[in-house]
Amino acid sequence: MIQSPTSFLIVLILLWCKLVLSCFREFIIALQQLIQVLLQIINSNLQSRLTLWHSLD
């Protein structure tokens, strides 16, 4: 009787870990996409500033 609940608990913990890992992976992917977008925005800002400087000269 004791063995059944413990194995059930172990399975539950493993499933929970799997869920946490998949959520973490999704979070990291979303974070990478956000960083890429931010870098693109920064790049376009820098390029427009550079063209402004060149047009002033």
From Swiss-Prot:
Function recorded in the entry: Involved in resistance to IFN.
Species name: Avian infectious bronchitis virus (strain Beaudette) (IBV)
Lineage start: Viruses, Riboviria, Orthornavirae, Pisuviricota, Pisoniviricetes
Superkingdom of the source species: Viruses
Name used for this protein in its record: Non-structural protein 3a
UniProt key word Cell membrane: no
Classification via InterPro entries: IBV_3A
Keywords for the protein's UniProt record, in alphabetical order: Host-virus interaction, Inhibition of host innate immune response by virus, Interferon antiviral system evasion, Signal, Viral immunoevasion
Pfam family, one: IBV_3A
Residues annotated as signal peptide: 1-23
Disulfides per UniProt: none
Biological process (GO), any one: symbiont-mediated suppression of host innate immune response
